[in-house]
């Protein structure tokens, strides 16, 4: 549950 996780910001976010 890391808000800075690349899978969260650079994954589905794109």
Curated annotation (Swiss-Prot):
List every position bearing Leucine amide. 14
Q: Where in the cell is it found?
A: Secreted
Q: What tissues has this protein been observed in?
A: Expressed in the brain, subesophageal ganglion and in the retrocerebral complex (mainly corpora allata).
Q: Which GO terms describe its molecular function?
A: neuropeptide hormone activity
Keyword terms: Amidation, Neuropeptide, Secreted
Name the job this protein performs: Myoactive.
Biological process annotations from GO: neuropeptide signaling pathway
The answer to whether keyword Ligase applies is no
Q: Which InterPro entries match?
A: Pyrokinin_CS
Q: Which organism is it from?
A: Pseudoderopeltis foveolata
* Keyword Secreted tagged: yes
Where is it mostly found?
Answer: secreted
Family of the protein in this entry: Belongs to the pyrokinin family.
Q: What is this protein called?
A: Pyrokinin-6
Q: Which domain of life is it from?
A: Eukaryota
Give Gene Ontology CC terms.
extracellular region
